[in-house]
Swiss-Prot record:
Keywords associated with the record: Chloroplast, Plastid, Ribonucleoprotein, Ribosomal protein, RNA-binding, rRNA-binding
Cell compartments where the protein resides: Plastid, Chloroplast
Name this polypeptide is given: Large ribosomal subunit protein bL20c
Keyword presence, RNA-binding: yes
Amino acid sequence: MTRVKRGYIARRRRTKIRLFASSFRGAHSRLTRTITQQKMRALVSAYRDRGRQKRDFRRLWITRINAVTRENEVSYSYIRLIHNLYKRQLLLNRKILAQIAILNKNCLHIISKKIIK
């Protein structure tokens, strides 16, 4: 029986996987089986955390807006601010409001006072 020389396709596939896992530690960057397992695990974590990141940032923005709105008036809160914004049909999302709250608190106080009236 003659010797069969395998092509370069499997090697190319493995090197592509190794490039993905080159920053991993230990056997996770050297052994092909563990590389494939860790690659799948990394991609699952990345997919899961993209959704989690959106939730976390929204929570952060809400916390920042609430902290700044409660500084002046104790009774006035985040939920009342958002409700009044919708009533007045002002299109300011939470990200923009949080940036205004951090960079220019007076501007947010002016906006909230105008909305109340």
